[in-house]
Amino acid sequence: IEATAYAGDRSFVNAAKRAARRSRYTPAHFNGEPMHSGAATRITFRLSREQVGARPAFVKLYKAFFNQLKVGATTQQINHTYAALTDLGITYLYEDVFLAVVKSAYAERMGDHVRAERNLDRALRYQDDFKVFTTEKFHELQQQLFWHQVKSGSFGDAMKTWAVIEPQVRENEDFERFFKTIAEIKRLQDEGRDFSATGTVYDHYRYSRILLASAFSFTDVDGELAESKLYCDQGFLGFAIEPNVRYNIRDDYQNCTLVVIGDPDTTFTVTEHW
């Protein structure tokens, strides 16, 4: 049981983990019999819905950071404001969300679309429960997420995001750019061209991506990778990772997400094959 995001005193996290340990769930059944399957549960705890917003100091630094990006401030100035904001820390959930947006923008400024995608994806996950963004801002951030996924080589994730945002962008002046990008990804599929991306195991010991192709492999591993897990529409599989080995996915598994478990800061190249 792991607390993947929290704001407030650590005692609240400890209480939430104790509550999670006492929780029970009913396993999947087939023909009236329990079946072997993987399971993952995300539980959100909160004391009340009344606490919204952020501290004045956080808001001031947040606005200063994005204003510096807008006016083209020097890297030194941006680094200084970014450091001040991260050093301030988070007290409320809303600060956690918007700090993730800041980290995404900062990573983009540094040319790290993998980290930008990861932080923005985390921020957007709060929308369903807490409605932290206006509809217009949420759509804007979803479109940013799509481009980070494309630039980081997460084409399966990009296609999933596209299925959500396509109705939003049909009237955009930028629609042709979206359409050409999707057409190129589909052409890659049709022609069966392999493609690669850089992966990093972050502080929660995992990395994940939606697979577009029917096979994958790991190369250039710097660090320690322990195991992979495949979560598919029609099956689940876990296995130890061997670098430079091609793993083929059964045709009947369909629509798979690859999860990689390893030591934090381990980097590698993942290649998807057809």
Locate the predicted segments by residue:
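Eukaryotic alpha-helical solenoid repeat scaffolds
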Residues: P167-W274
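Acidic/histidine-rich, surface-exposed loop or edge segments in extracytoplasmic proteins
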Residues: E2, V59-K63
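Short, positively biased Gly/Pro-containing turn/loop motifs at secondary-structure boundaries
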Residues: K17-G53
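Extracytoplasmic/periplasmic, Sec-exported soluble proteins
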Residues: T4-F12, E50-A57, K70-A73, G111, ...
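Low-complexity, Pro/Ser/Thr- and charge-rich linker/hinge segments at domain boundaries
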Residues: R49-K60, D190-D194
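Alpha-helical protein-protein interaction scaffolds
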Residues: Y62-R193
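A short, well-structured alpha-helical segment
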Residues: I1-H29, N244, Y253-Q254
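A short coil-to-beta-strand element that immediately follows conserved catalytic motifs
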Residues: E2, M35-G38, A107
